[in-house]
Amino acid sequence: MLLALAQWLQNDYSFLRVVNYLTFRAVMANLTALVIGLAAGPWVIRKLTELKVGQAVRTIGPQTHLVKSGTPTMGGVLVLVSIAISTVLWCDWGNRFIWVVMLVTLGYGAIGWVDDYRKVVYRDPRGMSSREKFFWQTLIGLVAAVYLAFSVSESSNVRVWDLFLSWVEGGLSLDMPYKSNLIVPFFKEVSYPLGVAGFIVLTYLVIVGSSNAVNLTDGLDGLVIMPVVLVGGALGAFAYVMGSSVYSKYLLFPHIPGAGELLIFCSAMAGAGLAFLWFNAHPAQVFMGDVGALALGGALGTVAVIVRQEIVLFVMGGIFVVETVSVMLQVTWFKITKRRYGEGRRLFRMAPLHHHFELSGWKETQVTVRFWIVTMLLVLIGLSTLKLR
């Protein structure tokens, strides 16, 4: 919005030409989201407290968590509002990728909001059933995947529609452009063609998997939001490179027209995340809830797909991956041993993995900060793939 306004007025006020620069708008988007989050945070927390939207704490978990019972949850609304306002203010409204990421983010946020609402208002600890939640995640993920399959390699929605029609008329068979290949990090010009079906399946798995992985990681004060900020910021750097015909050519990446605008969204997400951390740091004044975790995870996955960095997301988001794998291993091993020995056995003291470390004697703040440090290292490895190829 401000970009269009500045372009309209820049002939009379030349200083407004600075708004045309993507990097300037990215910085302003970050600061705008940060200020909105910090300013609105106390009011949001107060309202959530008045509405008695409190977190229920499981008694089977670490006993130190019992004092958190009743802490306001659904604070992810603050993050999403900050991101949405800042992005709309500073982005180019004509950019199709911005709207795809925004719709996925808000769509997954809506799923999380319904889940949280049922838990805290109806006092139903189950919230949405797994089947219902998975259905809506799948629907949104597949719609985004189908659109992105034809959008990543094209420069306009008209070209996207033409490519889609070619796919349909060709009997659902189409040679996808090079830009839609799966990029292998650390190897120069090594990529694998996915085809339309492969692209859709991979995109779906990345978006849904990332959403659920971030949600599983959200279990301690401040644990998940800093990795989201770090990974989101790094993906913003990839978006800037892929969207630039100069930098993408120099660094041997495919040029994806319009991808650079995602730097605005990623910057806003980082700013909103830091603002939320101000209130979510131990001892937390508010929890994110599914409304925030599902949305932010879906956003990371969608951005990673657009900038063709699915594998790099897997690396930088290693904490999310390990947390998810720990749950899968725990459940699988429990079922196997119950069938074989008549009673279920556990690989970890408790899953996800952060609870295992807590029950092993680590303090909550130690787990959180150490997971942050690991994420910082993984993000640096991910960023190194920009040049080390």
From Swiss-Prot:
Q: Which GO terms label this protein's molecular function in UniProt?
A: metal ion binding; phospho-N-acetylmuramoyl-pentapeptide-transferase activity; UDP-N-acetylmuramoyl-L-alanyl-D-glutamyl-meso-2,6-diaminopimelyl-D-alanyl-D-alanine:undecaprenyl-phosphate transferase activity
Please list the GO biological process terms of this entry: cell division; cell wall organization; peptidoglycan biosynthetic process; regulation of cell shape
Could you tell me which InterPro entries the record lists for this protein?
A: Glycosyl_transferase_4, PNAcMuramoyl-5peptid_Trfase, PNAcMuramoyl-5peptid_Trfase_CS
The keyword Cell wall biogenesis/degradation belongs to this UniProt entry's keyword annotation: yes
Subcellular location, record wording: Cell inner membrane
Instruction: Give a Pfam family name.
Output: MraY_sig1
Catalytic reaction annotation = UDP-N-acetyl-alpha-D-muramoyl-L-alanyl-gamma-D-glutamyl-meso-2,6-diaminopimeloyl-D-alanyl-D-alanine + di-trans,octa-cis-undecaprenyl phosphate = di-trans,octa-cis-undecaprenyl diphospho-N-acetyl-alpha-D-muramoyl-L-alanyl-D-glutamyl-meso-2,6-diaminopimeloyl-D-alanyl-D-alanine + UMP
Q: What's in the keyword line of the UniProt record?
A: Cell cycle, Cell division, Cell inner membrane, Cell membrane, Cell shape, Cell wall biogenesis/degradation, Magnesium, Membrane, Metal-binding, Peptidoglycan synthesis, Transferase, Transmembrane, Transmembrane helix
What's the protein's topology in the membrane?
A: Multi-pass membrane protein
Respond yes or no to whether keyword Isomerase is given for this record: no
Which sequence ranges are marked TM in the entry? 25-45, 74-94, 97-117, 134-154, 190-210, 222-242, 259-279, 286-306, 311-331, 366-386
Please tell me which top-level EC class this enzyme sits in.
transferase
Record EC number: 2.7.8.13
Q: Annotated pathway, please?
A: Cell wall biogenesis; peptidoglycan biosynthesis
The main location is membrane
Top-level taxonomic group: Bacteria
Kindly state one GO CC term assigned in the UniProt record. plasma membrane
Q: Which cofactor does it need?
A: Mg(2+)
Family, per entry? Belongs to the glycosyltransferase 4 family. MraY subfamily.
What functional role does this protein have? Catalyzes the initial step of the lipid cycle reactions in the biosynthesis of the cell wall peptidoglycan: transfers peptidoglycan precursor phospho-MurNAc-pentapeptide from UDP-MurNAc-pentapeptide onto the lipid carrier undecaprenyl phosphate, yielding undecaprenyl-pyrophosphoryl-MurNAc-pentapeptide, known as lipid I.
What is this protein's name? Phospho-N-acetylmuramoyl-pentapeptide-transferase
What's the source species for this entry? Answer: Cupriavidus pinatubonensis (strain JMP 134 / LMG 1197)
- Encoding gene per record: mraY
